C-alpha cells in the first residue's frame, strides 16, 4: 500500500486531482483527513474533505514498480517551508 500526504486547496485542484485518479480506475485509492475517508476517484468525496489548511493522506493499492501515478500526483505534494 502506498501512502503520501497531498495538498488540495481549491475546487480546480480537486478537479485536476480527480481527473488524474480516474485514469487509474482499476486501482483502489482513498483520501483521508482526520476521521473522514473518501474514494479518491469521486469529485463529490474529494470536495467534501478539501480544506486549504490541512493535508490529506492519499493511499493507493499500487502494483510494484508503478511510477506513472506517482509522477502524476507530484503537483499535489505539499511543499516544505524552511
Set out the residue ranges of the language-model regions.
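Short glycine-/aliphatic-rich beta-strand segments at the starts of folded cytosolic domains
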Residues: 1-8
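Conserved residues at beta->alpha junctions
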Residues: 8, 33, 60, 64
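Amphipathic alpha-helical interaction surfaces in cytosolic regulatory modules
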Residues: 12-26, 36-52, 66-71
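Short polybasic amphipathic segments
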Residues: 28-31
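C-terminal structural segments of small proteins and small subunits
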Residues: 53-82
